[in-house]
Amino acid sequence: MKERSVGFVGGGRITAIFLEVLGGTGLDLDRVTVSDTSPEVLAKRKERFPAITTTADNTAAASCDRVFLALHPPAAKAALPGLAGALGPDAVVISLAPVLTFEKLGGLLGGFARLARVIPNAPSVVGAGYNPVAFGEGLPPAERSEVETLLDGLGTHPEVPEETLEAYAILAAMGPTYFWFQWQELRALAGSFGLGVAEADAALRAMLEGATRTFFDPGHTYDDVADLVPVKPLADAEPQIRQAYRDKLGGLYRKLSGA
């Protein structure tokens, strides 16, 4: 892929993840510009990635060849009209946010149509992400391939229909947060039961890998899997946990998708 300049409009968590991975997979960070309204955020990014250019001017990041829109939807909606004049005719804008469809993005960018949307998730930081991507009709095949190359180091990036991206935001992007605190609690309890850190982590990792493999094994239904362990200490709490999933995640999906 031809060496391109890369801009990040927004310097938050997801930008840090992208820089961490892309910098380790061959992207020349001295061709990267990160813009943000927070001096503290920019200082953190510059400290961790000294080669990048940081600025409070979003148009500087938007003037790059490949532009990642790394803002939450309300902030992106406010910022986009001011970026339209900075975009070059051959630029590509890659939105990392849910909610803002290609139609909305194009309208806010004055008709700019060279667009992609990605829903990234946190395991990308170790190259194990699941980052569904959709391409706007105005983005040619060569540029689509370039976007995919940029995403390669982050993990898997299946091309999906745009209308499914908000579902992936709930399932894959936010999914780790539904489990991480539970795993940490198990890790802490294991220590209180007398296991060392190495022993607890080895057992927890193996259990999670084995449980995942079992859950998705085509030879077992969910009922088969659930019946494999006779003692279920949290069975009394399952109804409340399931209802919390339905209430919280169902409501959030409706908000993101406008359903």
Go through the PLM ranges and name each one:
Residues S38, A97-L100, P120-S124, A172, ...:
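Glycine-rich beta-alpha junction loops
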Residues K2, G191, A198-A259:
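NAD(P)-dependent Rossmann-like dehydrogenase/reductase catalytic/cofactor-binding core
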Residues R4, D30, I52, A91, ...:
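A structural micro-motif
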Residues K104-R114, Y130-A167, Y178-F216:
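Internal alpha-helical scaffold of NAD(P)-dependent oxidoreductase catalytic cores
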Residues L27-D28, G88, G110, D152:
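Short conserved AdoMet
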Residues M1-A56, A62, A128, L189-F193, ...:
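NAD(P)+-binding Rossmann beta1-loop-alpha1 motif at the extreme N-terminus of oxidoreductases
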Residues F18-L19, P39-E40, R48-F49, T59-Y130:
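Rossmann-like NAD(P)(H) cofactor-binding subdomain of soluble oxidoreductases
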